């Protein structure tokens, strides 16, 4: 099969940002200018192509990352070939950070959208951290330059100070707010004015207005200096006082962007059709093709110590990462995969190396939001949806049967909030199980479990909005009506002291008995470790080796159920160092029970404490309500961190326990007459004060 587009002409990019910075509108404009859509969709009309779930159109926010393919040859057709863009539009709401995380994992570059009026917002920082984690080169696009309070250079300064990255403006604004006219292209040193008659598809170039010439010269000098640092050749030329050509400036900026040293910064107003075509040009000029990023690394499934690499090349063995599972009403399960190397044709068999299972590829489609075009092959650099996969979950590797590899997996955060759901009727009961199973397969940050004591179904997620959407989707997509309980906080338990505990389970009353006996030393685990670190210190066979795994299992099972108030015990070290056995009566079950009994005693002997999730909260409020907001956050046991000012008002940052934040949106609205906004995200677990912990422990014991 001949590749239709050379890999050098690919750009796999994500459009990422804070809620309401204008991501989806920007993506809609991209689809319009690249000719995929003949009519623009507006978010506030509920007609945006990329927002294809019913709830997205109603709420005006993007929840799932829709993937789409588009082609671009330049705003003035200046490139010799058409470039192929695979674009992923991601949600900006903090409850859906998981969608952003998994998109960034498979992208080669990102366009981070900021609002010219609001600047760097809390979610912008989260997205930026995620992009740093996966070393994603990026452009900054300062949108909404027509809005009141928009100030391009202020946002540039914030990117530098708050995000700690080196922004390099390659454009400047001509006018701002309602007088925003266009931009200055600092590379060509021309003023650009957009043509309203064709919805900003074309523009005219003029000389830079005299009053902006000095500013343009100053920022152009910064840009050239940034480009010249790319390599010795350009540096020498720059130091010798020679003029760098346009090609050299672009090459220098490109090299440093791909190395994640700088962020080229551009501007526009997507809604007013000013600037998006130049952003597409910048994606081609400065963001990498799949062949320009380092080879993807992985391990050999048979030998975890053996590191393997796959280069973005059709001749290499096939490897791909399944980064998203979606349920489609017509074809069933869609597995979105990013192909890193090799070629795959429909009908081929691949290995799911994480699960060790063979999968046959039925059909493959390329997605345009929720429209599908069937394709026969996918090559290195492609993003496509595979139909008919049975056992694939997010983060699994698909690879060549004969050349297995496990690509680096994605880390998903644990949920911080739970609610009980109950089906309204008997008919809903069965459907609810199926619906929740499918939704959990799609979204790794969403969990479902059954409470053993009450028999209730408990769903857990990243925030109230996250769970609202899940329940809403159950109703719409699976016709399941359910009642929702009050939100519950996902507490954790941890021990403070090191202690040695004897676990003894003996039942001997004639016939085959039970005999399990062990001594275990428990200690708090190392910082940053979540689970159990188990050490076998048995010498001389006082406990036979075959019973050691049963002891570990007994500890792990008790950790799941906790020792204090029924919440999972985390961050534990356990060393089994002594014990005894009986030739006839000892068995695995007896040792498992003995270890479990020893672990239970940690509530007293280990000084077990309750941990509560703490949220990073950021409130933006008009100045006159600042005192009320601060007082209210303090009453909620909040620790005020710092604050600053933006045109939107005062910004207050605090850390507040999640248990105190339920219903905060409503009380904040009434306190500020609906003029303040807030966002929060999980930051860490911290020890709950005794007064709170005692109440929770008593409640769990039914006192």
From Swiss-Prot:
Keywords: Cytoplasm, Elongation factor, GTP-binding, Nucleotide-binding, Protein biosynthesis
PROSITE patterns in the cross-refs: G_TR_1, G_TR_2
GO CC annotations on file: cytoplasm
Single GO BP term: ribosome disassembly
Boundaries of every tr-type G domain copy: 8-291
Family annotation (HAMAP family): EF_G_EF_2_B
Protein name stated in the entry: Elongation factor G 2
């Amino acid at each position: 099969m001949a590749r239709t587009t050379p890999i050098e002409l690919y750009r796999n990019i994500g459009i990422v940002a804070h809620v309401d910075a204008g991501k989806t509108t920007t993506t809609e404009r991209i689809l319009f200018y690249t000719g995929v859509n003949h009519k623009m969709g507006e978010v506030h009309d509920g007609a945006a192509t990329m927002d294809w779930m019913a709830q997205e159109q109603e709420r005006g926010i993007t929840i799932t990352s829709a993937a789409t393919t588009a082609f671009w040859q330049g705003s003035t057709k200046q490139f010799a070939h058409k470039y192929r863009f695979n674009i992923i539009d991601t949600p900006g709401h903090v409850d859906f950070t998981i969608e952003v995380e998994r998109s960034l994992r498979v992208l080669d570059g990102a366009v981070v959208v900021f609002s010219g009026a609001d600047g760097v917002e809390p979610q912008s920082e989260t997205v930026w951290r995620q992009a740093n984690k996966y070393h994603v080169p990026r452009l900054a696009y300062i949108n909404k330059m027509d809005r009141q309070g928009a100030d391009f250079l202020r946002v540039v300064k914030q990117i530098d100070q708050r995000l700690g990255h080196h922004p390099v403006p390659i454009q400047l604004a001509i006018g701002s707010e309602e007088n925003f006219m266009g931009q200055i292209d600092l590379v060509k040193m021309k003023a650009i004015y957009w043509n309203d008659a064709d919805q900003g598809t074309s523009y005219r170039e003029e000389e830079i207005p005299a009053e902006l010439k000095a500013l343009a010269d100053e920022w152009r000098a910064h840009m050239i200096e940034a480009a010249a640092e790319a390599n010795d050749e350009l540096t020498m030329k720059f130091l010798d006082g020679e003029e760098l050509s346009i090609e050299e400036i672009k090459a220098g900026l490109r090299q440093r962007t791909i190395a994640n040293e700088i962020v080229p910064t551009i501007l526009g107003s997507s809604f007013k059709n000013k600037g998006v075509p130049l952003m597409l040009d910048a994606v081609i000029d400065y963001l990498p093709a799949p062949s320009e990023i380092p080879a993807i690394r992985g391990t050999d499934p048979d030998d975890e110590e053996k590191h393997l690499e796959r280069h973005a090349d059709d001749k290499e063995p096939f490897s791909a990462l399944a980064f998203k599972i979606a349920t489609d009403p017509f074809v069933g399960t869609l597995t979105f995969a990013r192909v890193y190397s090799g070629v795959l044709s429909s009908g081929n068999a691949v290995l799911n190396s994480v699960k060790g299972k063979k999968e046959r590829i039925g059909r493959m489609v390329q997605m345009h939001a929720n429209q599908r075009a069937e394709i026969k092959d996918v090559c290195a650099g492609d993003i496509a949806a595979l139909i008919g996969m049975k056992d694939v979950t997010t983060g699994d590797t698909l690879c060549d049967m004969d050349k297995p590899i496990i690509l680096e997996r994605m880390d998903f955060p644990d949920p911080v909030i739970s609610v009980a759901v109950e089906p309204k009727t008997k008919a809903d009961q069965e459907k609810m199980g199926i619906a929740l199973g499918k939704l959990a397969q799609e979204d790794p940050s969403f969990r479902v479990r059954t409470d053993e004591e009450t028999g209730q179904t408990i769903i857990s997620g990243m925030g109230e909005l996250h769970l609202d959407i899940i329940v809403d989707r159950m109703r719409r997509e699976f016709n399941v009506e359910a009642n929702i309980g009050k939100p519950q906080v996902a507490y954790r338990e941890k021990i403070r002291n090191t202690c040695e505990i004897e676990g003894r389970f003996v039942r001997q009353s004639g016939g085959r008995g039970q005999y399990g006996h062990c001594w275990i030393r428990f200690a708090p685990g190392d910082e940053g470790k979540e689970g159990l670190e188990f050490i076998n210190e048995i010498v001389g066979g006082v406990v036979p080796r075959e019973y050691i795994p049963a002891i570990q299992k007994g500890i792990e099972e008790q950790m799941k159920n906790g020792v204090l108030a029924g919440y999972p015990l985390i961050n534990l070290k356990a060393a089994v160092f002594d014990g005894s056995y009986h030739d006839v009566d000892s068995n695995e079950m007896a040792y498992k029970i003995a270890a479990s009994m020893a672990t239970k005693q940690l509530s007293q002997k280990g000084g077990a404490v309750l941990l509560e999730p703490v949220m990073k909260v950021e409130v933006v409020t008009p100045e006159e309500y600042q005192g009320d907001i601060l007082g209210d956050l303090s009453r909620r046991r909040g620790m005020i961190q710092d604050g600053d000012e933006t045109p939107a008002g005062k910004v207050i940052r605090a850390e507040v326990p999640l248990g105190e934040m339920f219903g905060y949106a409503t009380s904040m609205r009434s306190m500020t007459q609906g003029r303040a906004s807030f966002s929060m995200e999980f930051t860490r677990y911290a020890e709950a004060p005794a007064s709170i912990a005692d109440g929770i422990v008593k409640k769990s014991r039914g006192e």
